Amino acid sequence: MRIIFSLIFLTTPALAWEFTPTPICTLSHTEPTVDIAVTYDHATHLYAIAVTSPDGWPDAAAFSIRFDGAQPNTISTTRHSTEANTLIVTDVGFGNVLDGLEFNATATAFTQTAAVTVSLMGAAPEVQKFRACATAPVA
């Protein structure tokens, strides 16, 4: 019985939030219905969030992210683009996005006709590493 449970856990994809500092600061998370990547590039001084859904993203006038939990907030923009199944937003500041990811339980990315929700369980320590990377001096 233990072997069966071990095999199940080994073949189940990890749903953890992950931070990597190279080649650029990256915070990522994968669930069956969505992949999210938040990046910061010291060379361009731009933050980006890419939300990939297997169902794609229809053309929409606005894109929003709603954070539910201890510090609820909704952030909206009309400055987004889509490439294949990925919706992308770039900006010079992402404080509200990072706060939402760090201090809440779920995030729902949505347009007028499509939405995906992700768990933020375990995101906080990875967001803190991402923040440190984004503010670290570059030689």
Question: Residue ranges of each PLM-predicted region?
Answer:
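Internal interaction segment
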Residues: 69-139
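N-terminal processing/targeting junctions
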Residues: 13-15, 73
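An ectodomain-focused feature that recognizes extracytoplasmic/extracellular
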Residues: 16-60
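Short beta-strand/loop motifs in extracellular/secreted proteins, especially
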Residues: 59-63, 105
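Sec-dependent N-terminal signal peptides
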Residues: 3-13
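Generic detector of isolated residues embedded in canonical secondary-structure elements
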Residues: 15-16, 100
